[in-house]
Amino acid sequence: MSESGDQDVPERIEVQRPIAADAAAIFAVVSSPEGHVQIDASGMLMSSTGEPATAVGDTFVIHMDREALNDYPLGLYDVTVEIVTYEQDREIAWTIVGQIKPQIGHVYGYRLEPVEDGTLVTSFYDWSDIHEDWKAMGIFPVISEDALRGTLGILDRTVRRGYPRPA
């Protein structure tokens, strides 16, 4: 309970899954715009434009359709992914920069840790620093723990199948 008597509500979700692949193979997927689309379990990510991230500040565009969530009729729209944490083969995190104001401020990401048979992948979604206007709406989290867990399963399958394939 908080001091005001309200029950504390978590503002971050983390899920983990061991994947039988090295961190470089996994990072190649999670740092790639097309990789994001390939592994999305929410059904919102339709396609992408841009190059794989290589540093903090890099951006790429994801073409979205929120219809899969059946909550807000936004139709087709684009968001810009801006990388806020980048450690090659270890961690990547990003925020979403959209056309709406104020910017939301939620962060998504992956941490990769070597383990005996591959890599332990942690997927996280953090909305603790969202703008107060958005916090007051009570619509967070946008993505559920189940969706994060599903994305890790798809990531595992995607890496096992050899994505991304060399050109």
Spans of model-derived segments:
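Intrinsic-disorder/low-complexity, polar/charged segments enriched in Ser/Thr/Lys/Arg/Asp/Glu/Gln
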Residues: 10-18, 59, 78, 91, ...
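A short, structured loop/turn motif at beta-sheet edges
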Residues: 20-24, 51-55, 84-91, 111-120
